[in-house]
């Protein structure tokens, strides 16, 4: 019984890396950022920017290295004197989706006058694309399609 279990575990160990491998594919996206510091009441919105040299994960659709886009905004804010900013990045393949999320954030922070809202134009801050290295850009193994043959018995 233990031999069967070992065989199954060995097979699972060989299959899991193949299942988790996903290539990065070139995908243009719309992207914007939001930054705030919980030490004051100022919030910052970037413009919605079109980036044509970005990459997404072929399985999940997530922006490649998406945390680094937030770090870009955070470093920009720190260079401009904002202490401990918390930054988020919103992205989508469709501008309409980004505009919807942008409007929801803007509604939350711009109404009622509780926050000082500042807007960063593209000339103030622009995201820089992050390009994966060659090993991450290789195409993911594609599953072969099995043709269904119609065997008609006469």
Regions found by a protein language model. Name each.
Residues 1-26:
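Bacterial Sec-dependent N-terminal signal peptides
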Residues 8, 69, 98-101:
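Alpha-helical structural motif
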Residues 65-73, 124-127:
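Low-complexity, flexible helical/coil segments
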Residues 82-145:
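Surface-exposed, polar helix/loop patches in the mature regions of secreted/periplasmic/lumenal proteins
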Residues 146-154:
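Long, low-complexity, intrinsically disordered segments
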């Amino acid at each position: 019984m233990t031999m069967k279990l070992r065989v199954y575990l060995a097979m699972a160990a060989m299959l899991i890396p193949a299942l988790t491998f996903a290539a990065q594919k070139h995908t243009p996206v719309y992207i914007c950022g939001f930054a705030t510091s919980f030490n004051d009441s100022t919030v910052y919105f970037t413009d919605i920017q079109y980036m044509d040299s970005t990459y997404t994960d072929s399985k999940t659709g997530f922006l490649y290295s998406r945390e680094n886009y937030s770090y870009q905004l955070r470093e920009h804010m720190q260079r401009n004197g904002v202490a401990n900013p918390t930054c988020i990045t919103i992205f989508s393949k469709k501008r309409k989706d980004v505009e919807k999320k942008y409007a929801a954030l803007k509604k939350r922070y711009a109404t009622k006058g509780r926050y000082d809202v500042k807007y960063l134009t593209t000339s103030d801050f622009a995201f820089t694309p992050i390009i994966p290295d060659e090993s991450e850009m290789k195409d993911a193994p594609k599953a072969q399609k099995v043709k269904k043959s119609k065997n008609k018995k006469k």
